[in-house]
Amino acid sequence: MAVIVPVITVDGPSGAGKGTLCQALAKAFGWHLLDSGAIYRVLALAALHHHVDITSEDALVPLAANLDVRFIPNENGLSVILEGEDVSTEIRTETVGNTASQAATFPRVREALLRRQRAFRTAPGLIADGRDMGTIVFPDAQVKIFLDASAQERARRRMLQLQEKGFNVNFERLLSEIKERDYRDRNRAVAPLVAAKDALILDSTSLSIDEVIEKSLAYAKKICN
């Protein structure tokens, strides 16, 4: 009888704190970690590198099907490797993020990357970070968490992150981009951003990251144990 590899999914909008939570869960359980959003960002960056038309689904599908991407754990979470090059920092720019969100609206692009994401499900278990992990990619996941926060709070967090890295950012522009991305993600025809019916919904707007981790760990351990 085939052994079912356990999965914990963490979905939610950009900037809600999913990445930090998933890294904490992966460390606590000793499981693999999949940053599905990074896959779309890597695809977007690959399209920019290879001058592929990001508005053309036909052009993006073969690139997605043959995407050379690896995730290597490190002290800070994950190193994202594209075609042998560490692009962990490059894929986190707002330009790449917005391009990735556009690419994610294409059904055949999502299908090409769906198979790749499911291949990350290996023993002893997987923590999956994304927007449709609990609804589309791993609907049979044992634990599903939907992490949310207000657009204003997410813009504030993102601004601080970028400033710490030396980027000069405008809060209002950042807030506008987050709202636009939210609208695209929540209203796209294929796999819109929505909480799974059996997910624990956590609003992190007024919570510290430690409180989010504590609540999520308690919930996950109760189910997984």
UniProtKB/Swiss-Prot annotation:
State the family named in the UniProt similarity comment for this chain: Belongs to the cytidylate kinase family. Type 1 subfamily.
List the NCBIfam families hit by this protein, alphabetically: cmk
* Stated name of the protein: Cytidylate kinase
Query: Which Enzyme Commission numbers does its entry carry?
Result: 2.7.4.25
For this record, an example GO cellular component is: cytosol
TM ranges are none
Task: Report residues binding ATP.
Answer: G12, P13, S14, G15, A16, G17, K18, G19, T20
| InterPro entries assigned | Cytidylate_kin (IPR003136), Cytidylate_kinase_dom (IPR011994), P-loop_NTPase (IPR027417)
What top-level class of enzyme does the UniProt entry assign? transferase
Example GO molecular function term? ATP binding
Q: Which reaction does it catalyse?
A: CMP + ATP = CDP + ADP; dCMP + ATP = dCDP + ADP
Keyword Transmembrane helix applies: no
A single GO BP annotation from the record?
Answer: pyrimidine nucleotide metabolic process
